[in-house]
C-alpha cells in the first residue's frame, strides 16, 4: 500500500509545483504525513493547497486513511535524494552511514556536493567521501 500511495502523493505534489521531501505512513495506515518544499519556502497556504488537492485525489482513488498532515520539512530538513546533496552544498549536515568508515558511522561537516555518486563532506578530520547508497540518514544542521 505504501508504495502506491507514495507514488500518488509524488504525482500530486510535483504536479502542483512542489517537491516531495518525505512521506510517512503510520503502521496501520491511518495517518499520512507529507513533507513538501519549494525554493521560496513553504507557507501555510502551500500546505493547505496540497492538503486539499490530496484529499480530493484520495477520495477519487479510494485511499483509506483517518488523518492527513502536510508540512514543511523544517530547518533540520532530511536529505533523501542525490539532488538534495547537490542543492544544499555549502551547508552543515549530520550524516549517518549504514557501514562505518574508520570505526565511525556518524559525521558532522560542511557538505561539499556530490562526486561520482558519493557525497563529499568536509569534517574536522578532512574530506569524507560517503557512497550515497550507504547513507542511512542525513539532515541539515540548523543555524541560529
From Swiss-Prot:
Main location: cytoplasm
Coiled-coil portions: none
GO biological process: ribosomal small subunit assembly; translation
Signal peptide, first to last residue: none
Entry-linked CDD domains: YlxS_C (cd01734)
Protein localization: Cytoplasm
GO cellular component: cytosol
Gene3D superfamilies for the chain: Ribosome maturation factor RimP, C-terminal domain, RimP-like superfamily, N-terminal
Keywords (A to Z) from UniProt: Cytoplasm, Ribosome biogenesis
Entry similarity comment: Belongs to the RimP family.
NCBIfam families xref list: PRK00092.2-1
General function of this protein: Required for maturation of 30S ribosomal subunits.
Protein name: Ribosome maturation factor RimP
Amino acid at each position: 500500500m505504501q508504495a502506491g500511495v507514495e507514488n500518488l502523493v509524488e504525482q500530486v505534489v510535483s504536479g502542483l509545483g512542489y517537491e516531495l521531501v518525505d512521506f510517512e505512513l503510520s503502521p496501520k495506515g491511518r495517518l499520512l504525513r507529507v513533507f513538501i518544499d519549494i525554493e521560496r519556502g513553504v507557507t501555510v497556504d502551500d500546505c493547505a493547497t496540497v492538503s486539499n488537492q490530496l484529499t480530493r485525489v484520495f477520495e477519487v482513488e479510494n485511499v483509506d486513511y483517518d488523518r492527513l498532515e502536510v508540512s514543511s520539512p523544517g530547518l533540520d530538513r532530511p536529505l533523501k535524494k542525490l539532488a538534495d546533496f547537490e542543492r544544499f552544498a555549502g551547508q552543515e549536515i549530520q550524516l549517518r552511514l549504514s557501514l562505518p568508515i574508520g570505526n565511525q558511522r556518524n559525521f558532522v561537516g560542511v557538505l561539499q556536493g556530490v562526486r561520482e555518486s558519493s557525497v563529499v563532506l568536509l569534517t574536522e578530520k578532512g574530506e569524507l567521501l560517503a557512497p550515497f547508497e550507504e547513507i542511512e540518514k542525513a539532515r541539515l544542521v540548523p543555524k541560529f
